[in-house]
């Protein structure tokens, strides 16, 4: 039987400016942020959360992403794609049961369509928005990453089915956290022998967002962004959860990375 574990992995980095991550801060200073993704192993089948950058940007960033590379430049080695990293841990991509998407921005879609037996779980509002984003958000969605034939999708419906229990045993719970993107969701991971871990993903890029010291440099709704952080703070306190923010280079350094794991 497979143990229930959480692996924290990284799909390269993004080079940008401080103000791209922390609104109106940094005076134009350069900033480099990690691109995390996660693997949950489970006897019922494994889950990949997000998958990071698409492997195509390792060889042709501008060809795959286009003009957004002028703002966010991906740094990714050819062996840092999510499939290769999961294989390197000794897991078969065919055993991945779920690919769960926090949202569909370009640095979170690296797993879509790359695991042959996976059901892809996403908020319906996010999926629909990704095909017809507003002008200011269009560069963040790379349609060829998620508009692929033959994919099996499972759609969640915001507050209607909030706190969805993916496995039915409490291991992985979704939390609807719109704001950064219209259909963003965060996750609570419960493990047999560790404190719960709250994966904010991009609901809180950094601890500055979490502590309400800064707004993120990109968001779809300021009000929703702020209220989603408040929701997560309450939820984290209720569950005594360790908070894992989305792209904080300082905080991310403090967590165990694969091949180490949380169990």
From Swiss-Prot:
Alphabetical keyword list: Hydrolase, Metal-binding, Plasmid, Zinc
GO molecular function: acyl-L-homoserine-lactone lactonohydrolase activity; metal ion binding
Top-rank taxon, per record: Bacteria
SMART domains: Lactamase_B
Cofactor binding, per record: Binds 2 Zn(2+) ions per subunit.
InterPro entries (UniProt xref): AHLLactAttM, MBL_superfamily_lactonases, Metallo-B-lactamas, RibonucZ/Hydroxyglut_hydro
Catalytic reactions of this protein: an N-acyl-L-homoserine lactone + H2O = an N-acyl-L-homoserine + H(+)
Protein residues bound to Zn(2+) 2: 107-108, 202, 247
Protein EC: 3.1.1.81
Necessary cofactors: Zn(2+)
List of residues binding Zn(2+) 1: 103, 105, 180, 202
Alphabetized CDD domains for the sequence: AHL_lactonase_MBL-fold (cd07729)
Similarity comment text for this entry: Belongs to the metallo-beta-lactamase superfamily.
Protein name: N-acyl homoserine lactonase AttM
């Amino acid at each position: 039987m497979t143990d229930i574990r959480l692996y924290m992995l990284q799909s390269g980095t993004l080079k940008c400016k401080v103000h791209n991550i922390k609104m109106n801060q940094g005076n134009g200073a350069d900033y480099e942020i990690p691109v995390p993704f996660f693997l949950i192993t489970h006897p019922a089948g494994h889950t990949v959360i997000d998958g990071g950058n698409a492997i195509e940007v390792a060889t042709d960033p501008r060809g795959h992403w286009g003009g957004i590379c002028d703002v966010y430049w991906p740094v990714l080695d050819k062996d840092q794609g999510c499939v290769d990293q999961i294989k390197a841990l000794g897991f078969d991509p065919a055993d991945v049961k779920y690919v769960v998407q926090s949202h569909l921005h370009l640095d979170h879609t690296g797993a879509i369509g790359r695991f042959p037996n996976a059901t892809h779980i996403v908020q319906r509002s996010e999926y629909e928005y990704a095909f017809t984003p507003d002008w200011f958000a269009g560069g963040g969605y790379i349609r060829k990453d998620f508009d692929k034939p033959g994919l099996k999708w499972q759609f969640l419906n915001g507050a209607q089915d909030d706190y969805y229990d993916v496995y039915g045993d409490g291991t992985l719970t979704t939390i609807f956290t719109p704001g950064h993107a219209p259909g963003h969701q965060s996750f609570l991971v419960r493990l047999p022998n560790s404190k719960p871990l709250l994966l904010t993903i991009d609901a809180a890029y950094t601890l500055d967002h979490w502590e309400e010291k800064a707004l993120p440099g990109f968001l779809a709704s300021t009000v929703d962004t702020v209220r989603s952080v408040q929701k997560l703070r309450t939820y984290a306190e209720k569950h005594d959860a360790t908070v894992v923010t989305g792209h904080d280079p300082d905080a991310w350094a403090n967590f165990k990375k694969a091949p180490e794991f949380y169990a």
